[in-house]
Amino acid sequence: MKNQSENKVYTLAEVLGKHTIAELKQMTQVLEVKVLSKAKKQEIIDALSAKLLDKELLTAWLLAAGKQEIEELELAMAEDVVIAEESGRFYYWRNLPVVFVTGDGVVVVPSETAAVYNEIKSDSEYAQKRSRINVFDEYLMACVNLYRAIDITTFLSIVNGQTGLNAKRPELESWLKDREAVRGQQMYFFEGGYILSEEYRTKKEGEVVDYHQLLERQGAMSYYIPAKSELLRYADPYYVEKTPSYAAFCRFIQVRLGRLENEAAVIGSHIQLIMRHGAMPKDIFAEMERFGLTEENEELMSDFITVMMDMYNNTRMPETRGFTTVEAQKADPSRQKKIASASEIVTSSMPIVKNRIGGKKIYPNDLCPCGSGKKYKKCCGRVNK
C-alpha cells in the first residue's frame, strides 16, 4: 500500500475495515465506545470512526503529545514512512490509535483524521498552547534524561531563564495533570513537587522504583545547569557526551579489543548510557564479555578498569544532579567521603585484578587505578586480598 504522499488516500473506514471483528471490539473497549454485542462489523466501524474523529478528543490527544511526536505525526501525513513491525516509532499514535500500520509497514494517517488535525492546527488558541507545550516537552525530556528527578521550581527557573517563556507553576502543573490523564506516566510525570523520569512510575504493575532513594543520594547538591544548546541535547535519550574519557574508552575498545572504529563508538556510547542509568561495574563487565573482555587476561582487565573508571568519573550522573563525579568532588569536598564509599562498593563487585597495571606493580600506598582517589590498600587492594 502507498501513503497519502503518492495520491493514495486511505479513509478511516478502509483502515478499520482491514481489522477483524475481534480486533475492532477490543478497540471499542479501549476507547470506551458502546456497541451491541451482536453489532455488525460496519456498525462497529461507524461507532469507532465517530469516536476517533471527535475534535475535542483529538485535541486532548494532540496537547498530550510531545514535540517530537507531533513532528512524527506530520511527517507521516506528508510522506511515506515505513517502519519495522517491532519498531517503537509512532508508539503513542498507534496506541490511541491515530495512525495505523499496513501489512508492509507503511504508516497511515486516515484522510478524515488528517483533515480534523489541520482544522485543529489552524486554531490560534491551540497553536499558542502547542507552542508553549513544545518548549515544556523539550526541556522536560532533557531534564529527566540528565537528572532523573528535578523539582518543579528549579525546572521553571531553567526554562524561563533560557527561553523567556515566563511560565508559571499552575500552568505547568495543569498541563502535566491533563497529560497524565491521557497517556499515564510515560516519559515523565509530576509527583511530590518533582518532575520524574518514567522509571519511577508509581502507577504500573510490578516493582516500583522509589525516587526518594535518588533524592537522598543527591542530598542538597545544586543542579549542574548547562547552556541551552548543551542541555537540549539531552532531550535525545540516546545522547552521549563525547568527552576525552569517552574517546579514550573507545580507543581502548578499538585498539585492545580489535574492534572497528564505528563498532568501538557504538560500544562506548552503550556503556556510557548504562552508566548514566545506574549500571555498576559488574553490569559493565557482563556487557563487555560479549566483546572479548575476559578475566583471564589480567593485564587487559587492569587497563580496562582504568579507562572504564575514568569515563565513569567524568560522565554526568543523575546522582550528582548532572555534575560528573570529579566535578562534584571539587565543588563540594564534603561529598568526597560519600563518593569514596560508593566507589568502595563498586570495586567490591569487580573481577579480581592482581596488584599490577600495564606490567607495573601497584604498591599499597599508590593511588588505586580504579579512579576512586583512594590508596590501593584501602580500595581494590583490600578487595583483592
Question: How should each PLM-predicted stretch be described?
Answer:
Residues 1-49, 53-55, 63-146, 150-385:
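Acidic/negatively charged segments and metal-coordination signatures
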